[in-house]
């Protein structure tokens, strides 16, 4: 097979093994994979983008390092192994039928380290099959003993700077694993944030209804409390108080509040219709039934503030119309008196903002999908621009965002409220299969991302970086400011132990922030004794700190240090968009804290998501195509080509079989074109020894001009990772131009015309190199078959020959095509067989007028005429005026490139034009034969036409 052949040749020649030399370096990395399952086509896009860029820069003459490793730390594989051991049907089906693990291998996956070995080995194989130009000498796993020593040094360095501290903090937590969890540990809920909720205490008899809210300032407008009559509530002891919350809320809250014991179950129906006391106002408010109240979010008890909460407004409105519920709970006398109480004022809304937005969006009931949109819109604008109404004592006139915090603190200080934490959305499911909760950890180690000085320095890193796409920079700024202390240790999983507290393991997002620097020296460390890799060693290599504690020989340390200094800083970091709020931001934090400024990363590219036939890809749901299957079905080059052409890297791509098949056909055409060029030549092609020919025909010059324009545009696109645009230029548009050229010179193809052979050979030679980063196997094969020297993978990237790019030549071919189009349109309108077509060309004075108009730069007829008359370009001023008006209209549509020799251009293409219009064509440079006075209509770039 062609692809296997070239992969072996590259490996045998060690083509992509990169060592320091005197070339300019380019160091590119992509997020290393967590190999807990098979590679799918989404992964294919992730790892093909950096490979295309690496290959491109290598051909540009850079010394390129593109390494790969395996991120295997953390608890996910522990959970997978446990579920397989328990014979969990869903997990067994996933690994047998989606990840395609052979049945005899499945029992071995009960060992988490075997999972890591199995899938990292499979990833390695598939990456080879995709033709990735990786320096495999630098491969490692994050549980390798030498890597663990590196992580110990990293965490110790941060600890000594006071950036790792023990403390109390809310974290995502799996009670089953007894472990904090990060996104990598989750089956569902990746990227879900943790909200701080205020628990407000509404007294009812000797009990307290504890309501959870994100907006404590709205308590002044509370009209009622909502309880869900269909869920289980419990009475719990909280210090000296008795709280009413849902049973599910108790499960969550006991991870945050100590000694939260259940006293008894409580029937919500016994409370509905009774009155509770608002802790802030002292007013009594009723308790109403509401099926929309979630048992699992917050406390399961909600106060209603219909003036500013669209959901509360519409729920109250619906309840007032529900005679059955009103009768069931005897609410007739109470409910009529419940009306919205104004709290916030914001420009563009009335006294009751919720009513305004519900009316504007046409929301009719609680089931309306637009209700969520209304809530988000109103909450957002009130938080940013809203103020508390003047009539509220102590807070009137204050901005909502300030009043919220002040009122919360006042309520807490008076024991009218407390704090809890919950997920912004659910479910959040650990890879072990259990639901996660938010837990307050009081013996946990944290990264102090809350440190303001550290944040400021991290912003400096960001400001120096090139971010692609640029708009993502705002996201980074947001997350750098937003990030709080981060739980950086775990009790369960694979990984490196905290050097000073070895009951804890370093969690997987913390041990993957500066590993790019490890790539630079990994090839040396593989065979070294881990015990020799103490902090003093890494201090010397990375920070040039001398120490008597270094155990490695000085000459080896120097070589390793030189390697690091050659490759660092990292030029480009590529990753999906999900890690912007964690891994990619952590990378900037850690680089700012550990490395000097000249070692800070230089650029980041953020990817979009992958779809499969319009639906989101998900391994856990089986909605994926394995990359190895796609390679087998279509070849690696087709897969690469489709992934790079379907969307820019930061856009979402959609794998559609019909379009993939179309891509396959285009690649087949490319191969066929190479054979066709050799067939036209009539002898073996030698792309390194193309016989140059002096070109005179416009169409030949046009083809080389177009080729070089595509080279230029493709190069510019690739420099900024625009793979789709690069392929639009170097494949699709170039192919269109080649098709046109071949059609134009069709009558010469069997005549061994030297110019045609030269042009097509030149195009093919450049085209192979242009597509080599995208379809390396195909291009190596063609390069080898048609006389290319060495590997095209390291051949010189096509240089733009500016001397052959000509707007005049482009305009010349445009003239020919427009002339054919105009003649055929007129013939169709006339409806008669034309024996002869007369073409009249514009006289010189009209060209002079066009130049004057171009110099004026705008359709200012007065200026154009004035200059034309002053230059005495033509005697008939009335005619100048008429033509000047036409020029004024045309100059906004037609680009002026200077005078072109229309007579020669048309004469050059006369046979082609005559064939295309099926008539004899006669060209006139004057009006000596002009029976219908058509010549006067001739304009530059647009000849006049007479049909006979």
What is the predicted role of each segment?
Residues 216-301:
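Protease-associated
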Residues 71, 187-188, 684-715, 728, ...:
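Acidic, turn-prone loop/beta-hairpin segments
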Residues 661, 790-948:
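C-terminal low-complexity, glycine/proline- and small-hydrophobic-enriched intrinsically disordered tails
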Residues 1-41, 58, 64, 282, ...:
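Non-catalytic terminal extensions that flank enzyme cores
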Residues 201-204, 277-280, 284-297, 306, ...:
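Alpha-helical recognition segments enriched in aromatics with Gly/Pro capping
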Residues 18-81, 142, 151, 211-214, ...:
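N-terminal catalytic cores of NTP/NDP-binding nucleotidyl/phosphoryl-transfer enzymes
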Residues 4-5, 9-13, 82-220, 275-277, ...:
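Residue patterns forming the tRNA-binding/recognition surfaces of aminoacyl-tRNA synthetases
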Residues 2, 6-7, 159-160, 164-186, ...:
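Amphipathic alpha-helical
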């Amino acid at each position: 097979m062609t692809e296997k052949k070239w992969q072996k040749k590259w490996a045998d020649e060690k083509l992509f093994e990169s060592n320091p030399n005197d070339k300019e370096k380019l160091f590119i990395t992509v997020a290393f994979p967590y190999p807990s399952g098979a590679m799918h086509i989404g992964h294919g896009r992730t790892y093909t983008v950096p490979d295309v860029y690496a290959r491109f820069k290598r051909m540009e003459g850079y010394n390129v390092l593109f390494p790969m490793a395996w991120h295997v730390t953390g608890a996910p594989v522990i959970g997978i192994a446990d579920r397989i051991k328990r014979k969990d049907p869903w997990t067994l089906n996933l690994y047998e039928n989606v990840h395609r693990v052979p049945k005899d291998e499945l029992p071995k996956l009960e060992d988490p380290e075997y999972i890591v070995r199995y899938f990292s080995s499979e990833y390695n194989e598939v990456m080879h099959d995709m033709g990735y130009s990786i320096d495999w000498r630098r491969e490692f796993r994050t549980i390798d003993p030498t890597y663990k020593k590196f992580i110990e040094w990293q965490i110790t360095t941060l600890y000594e700077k006071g950036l790792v501290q023990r403390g109390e903090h809310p974290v995502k937590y799996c009670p089953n694993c007894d472990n904090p969890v990060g996104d990598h540990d989750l089956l569902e809920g990746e990227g879900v944030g943790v909200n701080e909720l205020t628990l407000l205490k509404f007294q009812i008899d000797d009990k307290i209804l504890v309501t959870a809210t994100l907006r404590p300032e709205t308590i002044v407008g509370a009209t009622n409390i909502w309880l869900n009559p269909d869920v289980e509530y419990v009475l719990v002891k909280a210090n000296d108080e008795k709280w009413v919350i849902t049973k599910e809320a108790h499960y969550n809250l006991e991870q945050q509040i100590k000694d939260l014991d259940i006293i008894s179950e409580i029937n919500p129906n016994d409370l509905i219709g009774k009155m509770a006391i608002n802790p802030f106002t002292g007013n009594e408010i009723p308790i109403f039934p509401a099926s929309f109240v979630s048992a699992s979010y917050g406390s399961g008890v909600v106060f209603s503030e219909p003036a500013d909460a669209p959901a509360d407004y519409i729920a109250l409105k619906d309840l007032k119309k529900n005679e059955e519920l009103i009768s069931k709970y005897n609410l007739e006398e109470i409910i009529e008196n419940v009306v919205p109480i104004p709290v916030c004022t914001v420009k563009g809304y009335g006294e009751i903002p919720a009513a305004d937005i519900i009316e504007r969006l046409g929301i009719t009931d609680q089931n309306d999908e637009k209700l969520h949109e209304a809530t988000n819109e109103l909450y957002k604008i009130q938080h940013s621009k809203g103020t508390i109404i003047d009539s509220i004592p102590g807070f009137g006139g204050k901005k909502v965002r300030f009043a919220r915090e002040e009122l919360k603190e006042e309520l807490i200080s008076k024991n009218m409220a407390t704090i809890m934490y919950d997920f912004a959305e659910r479910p959040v499911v650990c890879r072990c299969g259990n639901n996660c909760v938010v837990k307050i950890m009081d013996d946990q180690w944290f990264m102090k991302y809350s440190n303001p000085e550290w944040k400021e320095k991290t912003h400096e890193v960001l400001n120096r970086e090139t971010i692609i796409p640029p708009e993502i920079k705002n996201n980074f700024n947001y997350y750098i400011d937003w990030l709080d202390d981060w739980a950086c240790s775990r009790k369960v999983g694979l990984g490196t132990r905290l050097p000073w507290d070895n009951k804890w393991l370093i969690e997987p997002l913390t041990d993957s922030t500066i590993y790019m620097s490890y790539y630079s020296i990994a090839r040396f460390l593989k065979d070294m004794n881990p015990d020799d890799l103490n902090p003093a060693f890494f201090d010397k290599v990375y920070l040039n700190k001398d120490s008597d504690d270094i155990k490695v020989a000085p000459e080896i340390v120097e070589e390793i240090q030189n390697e690091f200094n050659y490759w660092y800083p990292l030029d480009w970091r590529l990753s999906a968009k999900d890690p912007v709020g964690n891994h990619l931001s952590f990378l900037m934090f850690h680089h700012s804290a550990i490395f000097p400024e000249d070692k800070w990363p230089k650029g980041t590219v953020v990817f979009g998501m992958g779809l499969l036939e319009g639906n989101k890809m998900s391994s856990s749901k089986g909605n994926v195509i394995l990359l190895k299957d796609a390679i087998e079905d279509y070849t690696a080059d087709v897969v690469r080509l489709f992934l790079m052409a379907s969307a820019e890297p930061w856009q979402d791509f959609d794998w559609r079989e019909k379009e993939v098949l179309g891509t396959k056909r285009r690649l087949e055409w490319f191969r066929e074109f190479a054979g066709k060029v050799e067939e036209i030549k009539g002898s073996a092609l030698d792309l390194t020894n193309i016989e140059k020919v002096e070109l005179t025909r416009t169409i030949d010059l046009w083809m080389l001009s177009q080729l070089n324009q595509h080279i230029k545009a493709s190069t510019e696109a690739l420099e900024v990772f625009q793979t789709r645009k690069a392929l639009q230029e170097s494949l699709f548009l170039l192919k269109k131009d080649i098709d046109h050229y071949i059609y134009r010179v069709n009558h010469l193809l069997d005549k061994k015309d030297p110019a045609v052979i030269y042009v097509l050979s030149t195009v093919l030679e450049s085209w192979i190199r242009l597509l080599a980063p995208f379809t390396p196997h195909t291009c190596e094969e063609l390069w080898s078959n048609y006389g290319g020297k060495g590997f095209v993978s390291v051949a010189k990237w096509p240089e733009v020959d500016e001397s052959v790019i000509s707007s005049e030549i482009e305009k010349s071919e445009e003239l020919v095509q427009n002339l054919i189009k105009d003649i055929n349109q007129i013939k169709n309108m006339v409806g008669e067989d034309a024996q002869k077509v007369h073409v009249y060309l514009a006289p010189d004075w009209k060209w002079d007028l066009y130049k004057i108009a171009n110099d004026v730069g705008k359709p200012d007829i007065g200026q154009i005429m004035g200059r034309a008359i002053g230059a005495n370009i033509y005697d008939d001023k009335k005619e100048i005026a008429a033509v000047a008006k036409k020029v004024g209209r045309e100059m906004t549509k037609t680009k002026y490139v200077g005078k072109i020799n229309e007579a020669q251009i048309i004469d050059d293409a006369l046979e082609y034009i005559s064939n295309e219009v099926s008539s004899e064509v006669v060209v006139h440079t004057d009006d000596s034969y002009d029976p219908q006075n058509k010549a006067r209509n001739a304009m530059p770039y647009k000849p006049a036409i007479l049909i006979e």
